[in-house]
């Protein structure tokens, strides 16, 4: 099977939570983010890393700016909006990539905590849940890959077949106006640069979802362990107390896991929140007023890409808050009424800690949730309204 990891492995195989990140880290290795620790190959690899950052993270946003400075008059309204919507996202993507790469050590360290959490997953039901979340996480990354690559490929083909480069980046060496061959060469070079940038952007957008999907699986397993507390009559009171202490330690490990990944997630999502409304607004204006059928298809793929950057993760954040509430209910409804005083005291301490939900704060300003995501996305309709009221679209068409 080509994509073996998108299906749950049989229980005869030993899977770990970190295996849910396999596709993610393979892509990181391909784009130059995970160099060998030593040897000559490390320096060869770092050269590749430098090239990807120079071309995909630095040149791409500057290439848009250069094209606006040198050939803005040659843009049609539709071409300009197609370029502008990606330009704004490219600057945001460069910021997100810088944040993710500089804090990559946090994501790697979080996998070590997952290994500690896996030590408690000995029951057959728990192993089955780990296998399921491993498949689901890798499947999610694969969906991101198809959508992001679909956008880049559809824009490339639709633009070239229409007789123009896909993004019209500044290129002082090749003039695409000098014949079909140079058009294809310039367009292909743009596509290669954009493909690298798209992969970098995909890594920055998909890791929050993957890491929180795994988090939810461990919250679910912890909830089931809490429900089983003092339900086994073969265990003594001291052994039941030890099981409770283990649940408390599991929760502390989960909080440590969240504390490590929060700074990375909060920075990248905050950057995306700042841009999503504006980018969606320009894209929808392009679709409604200036697009032909081919540009419309490419713009539609771009809209899906933009929505994938935040909506799945924000929805998962809502589910995590519900999971935390379910933990509280599980503790309260567990078999504690006739327990010892020491057991009840520890359980009360546990309950007080669990009542504080796990939340992610974008940029330390506002909570990441579906409501906040919808609020920032609504800005797109404000951009469209301003365009209609000022009659900007008709003025562009007239000019």
UniProtKB/Swiss-Prot annotation:
Disulfides per UniProt: none
UniProt entry keywords in alphabetical sequence: Cell membrane, Membrane, Olfaction, Receptor, Sensory transduction, Transducer, Transmembrane, Transmembrane helix
UniProt-listed InterPro entries: 7tm6_olfct_rcpt
Lipid bilayer topology: Multi-pass membrane protein
Tissues of expression: Expressed in olfactory sensory neurons in the antenna.
Recorded superkingdom: Eukaryota
Pfam families cross-referenced by the UniProt entry: 7tm_6
Residues that span the membrane, as ranges: 46-66, 84-104, 141-161, 179-199, 269-289, 293-313, 357-377
MF GO annotations: ionotropic olfactory receptor activity; odorant binding; olfactory receptor activity
Compartments, as annotated in UniProt: Cell membrane
Cytoplasmic topological domain: 1-45, 105-140, 200-268, 314-356
A GO BP annotation: sensory perception of smell
This protein's GO CC annotations: cation channel complex; dendrite membrane; plasma membrane
Segments in the Extracellular topological domain: 67-83, 162-178, 290-292, 378-399
Function statement: Odorant receptor which mediates acceptance or avoidance behavior, depending on its substrates. The odorant receptor repertoire encodes a large collection of odor stimuli that vary widely in identity, intensity, and duration. May form a complex with Orco to form odorant-sensing units, providing sensitive and prolonged odorant signaling and calcium permeability. Involved in the behavioral responses to ethyl acetate and pentyl acetate.
Assigned protein family: Belongs to the insect chemoreceptor superfamily. Heteromeric odorant receptor channel (TC 1.A.69) family. Or2a subfamily.
Miscellaneous comment text of the record: The atypical heteromeric and topological design of the odorant receptors appears to be an insect-specific solution for odor recognition, making the OR/Orco complex an attractive target for the development of highly selective insect repellents to disrupt olfactory-mediated host-seeking behaviors of insect disease vectors. Odor-evoked OR currents are independent of known G-protein-coupled second messenger pathways.
Quaternary context: Interacts with Orco. Complexes exist early in the endomembrane system in olfactory sensory neurons (OSNs), coupling these complexes to the conserved ciliary trafficking pathway.
Protein name: Odorant receptor 42b
Organism: Drosophila melanogaster
């Amino acid at each position: 099977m080509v994509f073996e990891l998108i299906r749950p492995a049989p229980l005869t195989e030993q899977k770990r939570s970190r295996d849910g990140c396999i596709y993610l880290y393979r892509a990181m290795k391909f784009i130059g983010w995970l160099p060998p620790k030593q040897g000559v190959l490390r320096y060869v690899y770092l050269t590749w890393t430098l090239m990807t950052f120079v071309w995909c993270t630095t040149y791409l946003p500057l290439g848009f700016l250069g094209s606006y400075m040198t050939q803005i008059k040659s843009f049609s309204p539709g071409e300009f909006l197609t370029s502008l919507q990606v330009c704004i996202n490219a600057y945001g993507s460069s910021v997100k990539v810088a944040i993710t790469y500089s804090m990559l050590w946090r994501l790697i360290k979080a996998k070590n905590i997952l290994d500690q959490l896996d030590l408690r997953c000995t029951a057959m039901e728990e192993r089955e849940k780990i296998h399921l979340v491993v498949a689901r996480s890798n499947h999610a990354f694969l969906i991101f890959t198809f959508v992001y690559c679909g956008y880049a490929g559809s824009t490339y083909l639709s633009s070239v077949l229409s007789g123009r480069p896909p993004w019209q980046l500044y290129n002082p060496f090749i003039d695409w106006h000098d014949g079909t061959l140079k058009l294809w060469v310039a367009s292909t070079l743009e596509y290669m640069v954009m493909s690298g940038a798209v992969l970098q952007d995909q890594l920055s957008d998909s890791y929050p979802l993957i890491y929180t999907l795994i988090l939810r699986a461990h919250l679910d397993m912890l909830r089931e362990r809490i429900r089983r507390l003092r339900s086994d009559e073969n265990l003594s009171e001291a052994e039941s107390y030890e099981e409770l202490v283990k649940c408390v330690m599991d929760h502390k490990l989960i909080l440590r896991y969240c504390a490590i990944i929060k700074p990375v997630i909060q920075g990248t999502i905050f950057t995306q929140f700042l841009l999503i409304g504006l980018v969606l607004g320009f894209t929808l204006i392009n679709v409604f007023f200036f697009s032909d059928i081919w540009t419309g298809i490419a713009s539609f793929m771009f809209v899906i890409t933009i929505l994938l950057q935040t909506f799945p993760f924000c929805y998962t954040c809502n589910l995590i808050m519900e999971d935390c509430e379910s933990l509280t209910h599980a503790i309260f409804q567990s078999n504690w009424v006739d327990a010892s005083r020491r057991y009840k005291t520890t359980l009360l301490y546990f309950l007080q800690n669990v009542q504080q939900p796990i939340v992610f704060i974008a940029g330390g300003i506002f909570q990441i949730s579906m409501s906040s995501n919808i609020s920032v996305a609504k800005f797109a309709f404000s951009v469209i309204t301003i365009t209609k009221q000022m009659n900007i679209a008709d003025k562009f068409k007239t000019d």
